[in-house]
Amino acid sequence: MFNKVTKTFQYGQHTVTLETGEIARQASGAVLVSIEDTVVLATVVARKDAKPGQDFFPLTVDYVEKTYAAGRIPGGFFKREGRPSEKETLTSRLIDRPIRPLFPEGYLNEVQIIIHVMSVNPEIDPDIAAMIGASAALSVSGIPFAGPLGAARVGYIDGQYILNPTATQLKTSQMDLVVAGTEAAVLMVESEAQQLSEEVMLGAVVFGHDQMKAVIDAIHDLVRDGGKPEVQWAPPAKNEALIARVAHFAEEKLRAAYQTKDKQARTAKLKDAFAEVNAEVAAEATSVGGAAPDTSEVGNILFDLEAKIVRSQILDGEPRIDGRDTRTVRPITIRTGVLPRTHGSALFTRGETQALVIATLGTARDEQKIDALMGEYSDRFMLHYNMPPFATGETGRVGTPKRREIGHGRLAKRALIAALPAPEDFSYSVRLVSEITESNGSSSMASVCGGCLALMDAGVPMQAHVAGIAMGLIKDGGKFAVLSDILGDEDHLGDMDFKVAGTANGITALQMDIKIQGITKEIMQVALAQAKEGRIHILGEMEKAVPSGTTGELSDFAPRLITIKINPEKIRDVIGKGGAVIRALTEETGTQIDISDEGVVTIASVDAAAGQEAKRRIEELTASVEVGKVYEGTVLKLLDFGAIVQVMPGKDGLLHISQIANERVNAVADYLKEGQQVRVKVLETDDRGRLKLSMKAALAEDNPEAAPQE
């Protein structure tokens, strides 16, 4: 009944199993991938033909985590999985990016890839299994696809590269890098690092690419034994006559438009040129009795012509679209403290790209609690990236962040997290929001620069300035050019775009997307060296605006955090019965108080005086009474045989009638009254913490001559 095919191979320290032919047989392709108890099912379905009039490739990738994979039932009223988590969105993008360039040009049939996480080992992140599964499912499906694709995670511990490190190993790794590619070329890199050099980062890319050959070989074997016949598909024939006529009408117009340096003016000229060319081509066709060509077909030809013009100009050494050479970074302006009531803010402008970044400080209660499939955890640093449509002079939907915004926010967060102070040095939780107010390329890297400056403005003691730069690469045969600080137009016309962020000491985040084969290690080396040059220039501009070591003062509107350590056994004294003591403390002082199991008390208050008052009262509550020490006490209650005296809040003891005075005391009321302040010495304390007090002993200590003579 089943034509099940299984392939197993060793991949680093893990055994990987690929299975096809048993599950999801009606999909175009389906592969079950297992890595040490982490199991994913990857399926792909392609439509038999393209929708009429469609002029783009509709590829969708959905990575879906099921809570049953971790042996849990979802929370909430409906007890079902909800909308995609940030992790699911980011992993979907991670799979999409290296796969998309491997479909042939002109293939417009809808393709849907769905990856379900069926079982998860908390030590093995499912993302690598998902990437391998998507590649294998496409390969066995027979769909036109220039794969297979391999994927690997690379760590860096004690100067050694680690292939597919576990979650435990990643905690001590200086790098978390994911690389994907075919047998011939690297196609995608996504990484964060602890300020590592370009050489170490490139070495990790090459190491990962070499190791993933094991994956590619296993998929080839799987296709040989369990693959479906190749789908017969041929790219649509190019209308060479139409291409020639469009080029005849459009080339000069497009070249003229690309002499305009301002983005909005250039966009307007290009729009006019497109309209004129469409009209001229249509008029020529109808004048000879033919039908006007499809406008989308003309548009695609114009796009190809645009790319050819811009690319050839750059490769011939001519100025770029905005007049720069290949290495120059656009003019940078920086302003901090932009918004009066926020905790920190910075306006970072680079050419026609601008980010207004706001920092907000909070307490441990403000940390983001994340119920992840691999285990629940809290995150003290959040970064949210928003790009409204007005940033590009357009109208559009405003609302839930799209995949692109989530991805850009995650990249900026990766870049900054390595330079944040340790929690023990700065116990605040931090939220950064990057509002992109103008965009013409490299907005995620503007978020990195603006984010670092906003954090410094908020008083966060950053380890160093962090800057980011977006780079491009254009290659034609043996000629290539690396572009620093790319524009939006250069982004989609190039063969490789990559973003590098870091400090003067090294890289903290690296993202690469390569659209063609033939990008060698040497080319990547040149590109990374030029990116470093650009990053150092931007760091210099940031240093001028906010010199190192000049972290801003905390805003008057930010909470002040006071941290004290108490004996864990005293925690109950601060909390009180049913939380009565701590509730009264927070209400009376207007502060927020958090106590860890280890006895670390964090007091948060916008009013510094209120925070100090809360600290004083907690210290009183947790202070230990010392035997043999004299205290100023308050008489709380008179008894027939003595009095109850409070020596400090929550600490009272018995002053026996025999210890009130040197002479005989017949009535306690003759010597004491409730509320009276008296000096008492602590004689002893029993195992239940009860105190025995003495006024006589205190008097003798204050005035030895008054002590009774033996």
Swiss-Prot record:
Keywords: Cytoplasm, Magnesium, Metal-binding, Nucleotidyltransferase, RNA-binding, Transferase
Cell compartments where the protein resides: Cytoplasm
MF terms (GO), sorted A to Z: 3'-5'-RNA exonuclease activity; magnesium ion binding; polyribonucleotide nucleotidyltransferase activity; RNA binding
Enzyme Commission identifier(s): 2.7.7.8
All residue ranges annotated as the S1 motif domain in the record: 628-696
Reactions it catalyzes: RNA(n+1) + phosphate = RNA(n) + a ribonucleoside 5'-diphosphate
Residues at which Mg(2+) binds: 491, 497
Alphabetized SMART domains for the sequence: KH (SM00322), S1 (SM00316)
Cofactor(s) the protein needs: Mg(2+)
Domain KH intervals: 559-618
GO cellular component: cytosol
A UniProt-annotated Pfam family: KH_1
Alphabetical GO biological process terms: mRNA catabolic process; RNA processing
Domain of life: Bacteria
PROSITE patterns: KH_TYPE_1, S1
Main location: cytoplasm
Similarity annotation: Belongs to the polyribonucleotide nucleotidyltransferase family.
Protein role: Involved in mRNA degradation. Catalyzes the phosphorolysis of single-stranded polyribonucleotides processively in the 3'- to 5'-direction.
PANTHER family on file: POLYRIBONUCLEOTIDE NUCLEOTIDYLTRANSFERASE, POLYRIBONUCLEOTIDE NUCLEOTIDYLTRANSFERASE 1, MITOCHONDRIAL
Record-given protein name: Polyribonucleotide nucleotidyltransferase
Gene expressing this chain: pnp
